[in-house]
């Protein structure tokens, strides 16, 4: 790979088509599916037909399984790059859980949110009378109290989800800017210590707090929960949460600026020159889409050239690998394989 080129691959299995025209800003940004774009030009097209079109670019759909896996990778990278801006002793992996006296839930007949709620089923009924639920305001209040107590600038990435076996709500968080003073070890796994803090438990006020030093593994763990839940809330899962009145699994994070922004501002030329992010574990990560959006604001022509080179190489490489199959067919085959793999593993 030459300097100035990106090694990012098209991870989307259902790419959309975007028109870019610097001299006609009113049509820049228009997006089409391959079928709709074929209708627009009046003939059936293949992705290969667009390879060398200077004003046409393939962009991720943001919804397919390939895009969701890439979103997990992007978040993992951004969480790590944010951590590089903080001392190690101020970056922690935290799990917030509820005790029986504080676990939130809903009475389905009234929609009332209450504490001390358990899942209650009546014989012969398809839905319970009451369910436990995530409560985003609990996270907001926790962070507000934490900032007030320590009078420090805090940043975070938080995923709210339900336990696999008990469906009990809890939260996983990467917390930046908090430096504990009263850690008490709970146990160790493979040399990694897990702690609690009386101060943090009081600030949380709803149950237990488990704390561990943040690592690349925990960054990926939290980001993985986000994408996993995004995938699970499609279809039947989405209907189940809706019917039960539960808050769907969610992610929330520090904004303005977004996570990893400071690293980008300090290293943007290096990032675009080398075309990848060098991670702590020795691996090279693709440049997050968040960074591409910032580049698009700063220098859209440069980003367009980078994406054009990436697109040509991706399609040409697939053409050589799978001679006789068009790019769309290859993507459909790859999507089926990826779905089977993720279903088998039970994760994204």
Predicted feature descriptions by range:
Residues 1-80:
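DNA replication initiation on ssDNA origins
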Residues 5, 24, 29, 41-43, ...:
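Intrinsic-disorder/low-complexity loop/linker signature
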Residues 62, 92, 169:
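Residue-level detector of short, conserved catalytic/binding motifs and their immediate flanks
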Residues 62, 136-140, 220:
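A structural signal for well-ordered alpha-helical segments within the folded catalytic domains
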Residues 65, 95, 157-159, 210-212, ...:
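Residues in well-ordered beta-strands of folded domains
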Residues 70-165:
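Signature for HUH/AEP ssDNA processing cores
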Residues 129, 152-153, 163-169, 173-309:
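Conserved His + Asp/Glu catalytic blocks
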Residues 207-210, 305-348:
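C-terminal non-catalytic accessory extensions
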């Amino acid at each position: 790979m030459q300097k100035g080129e990106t090694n990012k691959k098209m991870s989307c299995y259902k790419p959309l088509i975007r028109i870019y025209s610097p001299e006609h800003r009113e049509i820049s940004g228009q997006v089409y599916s391959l079928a709709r774009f074929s209708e627009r030009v009046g003939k059936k097209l293949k992705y290969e037909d667009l390879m060398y079109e200077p004003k046409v670019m393939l962009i991720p759909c943001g919804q397919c399984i390939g895009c969701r896996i890439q979103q997990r990778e992007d978040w993992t990278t951004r969480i790590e790059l944010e951590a590089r801006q903080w001392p190690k002793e101020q970056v922690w992996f935290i799990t917030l859980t509820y005790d029986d006296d504080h676990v939130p839930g809903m009475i389905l007949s009234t929609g009332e949110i209450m504490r001390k709620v358990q899942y209650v089923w009546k014989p012969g009924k398809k839905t319970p009378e009451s369910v436990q639920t995530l409560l985003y305001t609990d996270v907001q209040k926790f962070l507000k109290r934490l900032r007030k107590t320590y009078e420090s600038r805090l940043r975070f990435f938080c995923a709210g989800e339900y336990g696999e076996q008990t469906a009990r709500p809890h939260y996983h968080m990467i917390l930046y800017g908090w430096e504990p003073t009263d850690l008490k070890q709970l146990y160790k796994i493979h040399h990694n210590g897990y702690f609690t803090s009386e101060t943090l438990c009081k600030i949380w006020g709803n149950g237990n707090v488990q704390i561990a030093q943040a690592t690349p593994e925990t960054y990926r763990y939290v980001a993985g929960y986000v994408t996993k839940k995004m995938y699970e809330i499609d279809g039947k899962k989405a209907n189940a949460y809706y019917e039960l009145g539960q808050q769907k699994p969610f992610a929330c994070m520090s904004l303005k600026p977004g996570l990893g922004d400071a690293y980008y501002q300090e290293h943007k030329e290096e990032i675009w020159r080398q075309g990848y992010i060098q991670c702590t574990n020795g691996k090279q990560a693709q440049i997050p889409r968040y960074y591409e959006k910032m580049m698009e604001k700063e220098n859209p022509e440069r980003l367009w050239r980078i994406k054009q080179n990436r697109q040509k190489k991706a399609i040409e490489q697939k053409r050589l690998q799978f001679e006789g199959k068009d790019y769309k067919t290859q993507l459909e085959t790859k999507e089926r394989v990826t779905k089977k793999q993720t279903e088998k593993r039970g994760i994204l």
